[in-house]
Amino acid sequence: MGYKAIFFDLDGTLTNPEEGILNSIQYAADYYNVATVREDLKKYIGPPLVDTFKELIGEDKAEEAVEKYRERFAAGGGMYENEIYPNVRQTLASLKEKGYIMCTASSKPQIFVDKILEHFDIKKYFDFVGGASLDGSVSKKEDVIKLVLQQTGIENSQVLMVGDRKFDLEGARRMNMDAVGVLYGFGSYEELSACKNIALIKDITELEKILP
């Protein structure tokens, strides 16, 4: 397989942002008087925010709703209502020590990815922090992956994508990259097994069994 680089999704892969994201979606929905069921909002952890609010609020208000969400997520501290998953730090440290190029490829804006990695003291393991743009011009997973490839000069055939949702695995497939799905995040076994993957894992430490 000869992987030289690993691209990680953030939400549901490295950290569990459920509380902060759901609180921020709820904040925006309440502003527009849209009734929601909290459990049903979990499906929106992963895809681009504008797509979430097109479905929840309506296409005409989606971009405005993203700004309301960010009021709660950024200024309101929602990004730190978040937990790092077990074994993430030691696995990142081990993979870095083995010489892999480590990058994030998240649909969350890069500025927030950066702050969250710093908050959990894991930014030091990454060679490049890739995320979406605040203006929405880069938001879909394949566009983020393409940006990271361009910025780092890495060949797609040398990259393994790791993520918890179909958006991660499908984004990798569209960019002709291999992918591993993690089952401890927000995507079900059914969702991930329906996508092209080289493995589905229950713990991030299992990556070390896949990678030489």
Show where each model-derived region lies.
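Substrate-recognition element of Asp-dependent hydrolases with the DxDx(T/V) motif
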Residues: 88-117
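Conserved H-loop
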Residues: 35, 122-127, 155, 201
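N-terminal helical cap/lid subdomain that shapes the substrate entry/recognition surface
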Residues: 2-90, 94, 98
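Surface-exposed amphipathic alpha-helices with a cationic face
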Residues: 89-97, 149, 169-173
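Acidic, Mg2+-coordinating phosphoryl-transfer loop and its flanking beta/alpha structural elements
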Residues: 161-199
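Conserved Lys-Pro-Asp/Glu-containing loop-to-beta segment of HAD-superfamily phosphomonoesterases
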Residues: 5, 140-169
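A short, structured active-site edge motif that brings together acidic residues
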Residues: 40-41, 123-138
